Amino acid sequence: MRHTLAPGFGDPDNFELHNCDTQRNLSTEGIIQAQKIGKLLKSIGIVTASVYSSQWCRCVDTANNLGLGPILLLPPLNSFFQTLSKKERQTNTIRNWINSQNLDKPTILVTHQVNITALTGVYPTSGEIVVVKRTRASGLKLVGTFNQ
């Protein structure tokens, strides 16, 4: 899932990972969008999930506002938008991570457009969920996308 609405593009020059005041954050509309997505997921039976997030504040805030359970930070979900040299390594790391997980319950990864596009080929809008299925060959198959 791509984080919900956060006005702007990229991150400011003074970006610091552990300081939300230096980041592009969710707007009020983005917070409401995440809450609506959480309610919609609950209405179709996903009342709890394993939720993993990039360490970026806009992703953590999206994950928290879904209201589906505790959030675990997963650094391979961090954006590589400003460091494209990390694209291949990070994408392989997250693909291997997905393939090693027990996915008996719904699993939601909240991340960034560049990460999702590198992994799936899909260019998601803010708040869009890209559903993938693991294949026997340790790959991922696109099932579809969901955008409220």
Language-model features: locations:
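A short, acidic, amphipathic alpha-helical segment used as a generic capping/interface helix at domain edges
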Residues: 91-100
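Short, glycine/charge-rich flexible loops or terminal/linker lids adjacent to PRPP-binding catalytic cores
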Residues: 88
